[in-house]
């Protein structure tokens, strides 16, 4: 089998017992399968939930806390217990682990985004298994990923993974809830994830986790946009992950095996960078950006909104107000206001910035579903 870079996400329900406590037998089963993958030469990055589930028992809670403070306190206690379990288990296979705790803010800064990539790839080059979790004990609501499903999708994207494997307590995606409808149909393969499927999906699937099927669909949709194929399902035994890579997994395969990765710079522009303003463009510029792969020139700009600086990321909308993409601008809002609608030669007379483009095509990402820009 071809050596692959694989992101494996393990949910809380796949790590805990019926009471919600950390189950070391389940944890070891996952560890054994990851160790087997590494022995075969694959690169593995582990995204793990379970900190809150591991910590609420020692804190004296009878079940998973519902308040933010309770969850964060449980995560503070549970993260150490969770890592202790992983370190002890992986040590039996001679595997060194490295812990990385992230918040949404780590993805906003382009410098931190690149530093994160460098750290993880260095760990992989040294044979270390990166174990990643959201830093639940310090995250505030507006800086969270929502669940580790989305975190796993974002990590698989910027690491240019070959596959994202999301392990859960349900063996794949269904057209209805299989726990309440025994006639629910399981999908063995889905070419893509539609908005209608996401709207029809329910909420959290268990009392010990935050990620139900809806979050997994959203994560799969995001991973596919990065060029990463996805598997959602379950399994047991040391060969379960390799079986999944070979197409023999008990779950749902989503997307083609490989259809090209989105560049890391464009991932940051499209999904992570703060949006500093908005530019409206005419029909000709819209066609040039979406269909001809051209850069945005001053002549195509019809309106400027916000107070952004040069090299900020802005949204680009058409004359109907629909967002068609995002890009990194070479002009500040005030400079662009002076040169909008002008030819490139005329624009040079009014600005000290002699760049002909407002947004170069290398710093542009289309967000229109019918147009894919790599």
Swiss-Prot record:
<dbReference type="Pfam" id="PF00696">
    <property type="entry name" value="AA_kinase"/>
</dbReference>
<keyword id="KW-0547">Nucleotide-binding</keyword>
<feature type="binding site">
    <location>
        <position position="9"/>
    </location>
    <ligand>
        <name>ATP</name>
    </ligand>
</feature>
<dbReference type="GO" id="GO:0055129">
    <property type="term" value="P:L-proline biosynthetic process"/>
</dbReference>
<dbReference type="GO" id="GO:0005829">
    <property type="term" value="C:cytosol"/>
</dbReference>
<dbReference type="InterPro" id="IPR036974">
    <property type="entry name" value="PUA_sf"/>
</dbReference>
<dbReference type="GO" id="GO:0005524">
    <property type="term" value="F:ATP binding"/>
</dbReference>
<keyword id="KW-0808">Transferase</keyword>
<keyword id="KW-0418">Kinase</keyword>
<feature type="binding site">
    <location>
        <position position="49"/>
    </location>
    <ligand>
        <name>substrate</name>
    </ligand>
</feature>
<feature type="binding site">
    <location>
        <position position="136"/>
    </location>
    <ligand>
        <name>substrate</name>
    </ligand>
</feature>
<keyword id="KW-0963">Cytoplasm</keyword>
<dbReference type="InterPro" id="IPR002478">
    <property type="entry name" value="PUA"/>
</dbReference>
<dbReference type="GO" id="GO:0004349">
    <property type="term" value="F:glutamate 5-kinase activity"/>
</dbReference>
<dbReference type="InterPro" id="IPR036393">
    <property type="entry name" value="AceGlu_kinase-like_sf"/>
</dbReference>
<dbReference type="InterPro" id="IPR001057">
    <property type="entry name" value="Glu/AcGlu_kinase"/>
</dbReference>
<dbReference type="InterPro" id="IPR011529">
    <property type="entry name" value="Glu_5kinase"/>
</dbReference>
<feature type="domain" description="PUA">
    <location>
        <begin position="276"/>
        <end position="351"/>
    </location>
</feature>
<protein>
    <recommendedName>
        <fullName>Glutamate 5-kinase</fullName>
        <ecNumber>2.7.2.11</ecNumber>
    </recommendedName>
</protein>
<comment type="function">
    <text>Catalyzes the transfer of a phosphate group to glutamate to form L-glutamate 5-phosphate.</text>
</comment>
<keyword id="KW-0067">ATP-binding</keyword>
<keyword id="KW-0641">Proline biosynthesis</keyword>
<feature type="binding site">
    <location>
        <position position="148"/>
    </location>
    <ligand>
        <name>substrate</name>
    </ligand>
</feature>
<comment type="similarity">
    <text>Belongs to the glutamate 5-kinase family.</text>
</comment>
<keyword id="KW-0028">Amino-acid biosynthesis</keyword>
<dbReference type="GO" id="GO:0003723">
    <property type="term" value="F:RNA binding"/>
</dbReference>
<feature type="binding site">
    <location>
        <begin position="210"/>
        <end position="216"/>
    </location>
    <ligand>
        <name>ATP</name>
    </ligand>
</feature>
<dbReference type="InterPro" id="IPR015947">
    <property type="entry name" value="PUA-like_sf"/>
</dbReference>
<dbReference type="InterPro" id="IPR019797">
    <property type="entry name" value="Glutamate_5-kinase_CS"/>
</dbReference>
<feature type="binding site">
    <location>
        <begin position="168"/>
        <end position="169"/>
    </location>
    <ligand>
        <name>ATP</name>
    </ligand>
</feature>
<comment type="pathway">
    <text>Amino-acid biosynthesis; L-proline biosynthesis; L-glutamate 5-semialdehyde from L-glutamate: step 1/2.</text>
</comment>
<dbReference type="Pfam" id="PF01472">
    <property type="entry name" value="PUA"/>
</dbReference>
<dbReference type="InterPro" id="IPR001048">
    <property type="entry name" value="Asp/Glu/Uridylate_kinase"/>
</dbReference>
<dbReference type="InterPro" id="IPR005715">
    <property type="entry name" value="Glu_5kinase/COase_Synthase"/>
</dbReference>
<dbReference type="InterPro" id="IPR041739">
    <property type="entry name" value="G5K_ProB"/>
</dbReference>
């Amino acid at each position: 089998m071809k050596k692959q870079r694989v992101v494996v996400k393990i949910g809380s329900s796949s790590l805990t017992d019926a009471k919600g406590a950390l189950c070391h037998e389940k944890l070891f089963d996952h560890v054994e399968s990851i160790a087997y993958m590494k022995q075969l030469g694959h690169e593995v990055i582990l995204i793990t939930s379970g900190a809150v589930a591991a910590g609420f028992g020692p804190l004296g809670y009878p079940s998973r806390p519902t308040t933010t403070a309770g969850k964060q306190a449980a995560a503070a206690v549970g993260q150490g217990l969770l890592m202790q379990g992983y370190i002890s288990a992986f040590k039996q296979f001679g595997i060194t682990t490295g812990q990385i705790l992230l918040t949404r803010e780590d993805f906003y800064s382009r410098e931190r985004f690149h530093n994160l990539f460098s750290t993880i790839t260095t760990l992989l080059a040294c044979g270390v298994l990166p174990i990643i979790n959201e830093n639940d004990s310090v995250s505030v609501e507006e800086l969270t990923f929502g669940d580790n499903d989305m975190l796993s999708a974002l990590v698989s994207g910027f690491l240019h993974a070959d596959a994202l494997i999301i392990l859960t307590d349900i063996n794949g995606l269904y057209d209805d809830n299989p726990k309440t409808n025994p006639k629910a149909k399981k999908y063995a393969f889905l070419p893509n994830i539609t908005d209608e499927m996401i709207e029809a999906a329910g909420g959290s699937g268990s009392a010990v986790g935050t990620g139900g099927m809806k979050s997994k669909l959203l994560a799969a949709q995001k991973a596919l946009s990065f060029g990463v194929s996805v598997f959602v399902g379950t399994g047991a035994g040391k060969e379960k992950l390799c079986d999944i890579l070979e197409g023999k997994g008990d779950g749902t395969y989503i997307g083609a095996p490989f259809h090209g990765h989105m560049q890391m710079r464009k991932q940051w522009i499209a999904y992570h960078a703060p949006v500093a303003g908005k530019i409206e463009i005419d029909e000709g510029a819209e066609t040039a950006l979406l269909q001809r792969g051209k850069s945005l020139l001053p002549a195509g700009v019809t309106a400027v909104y916000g107070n952004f600086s040069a090299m900020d990321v802005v949204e680009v909308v058409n004359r109907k107000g629909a967002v068609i993409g995002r890009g990194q601008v070479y002009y500040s809002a005030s400079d662009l206001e002076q040169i909008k609608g002008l030819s490139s030669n005329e624009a040079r007379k009014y600005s000290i910035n002699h760049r002909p483009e407002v947004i170069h095509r290398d710093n542009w990402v289309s967000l229109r579903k019918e147009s894919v820009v790599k």
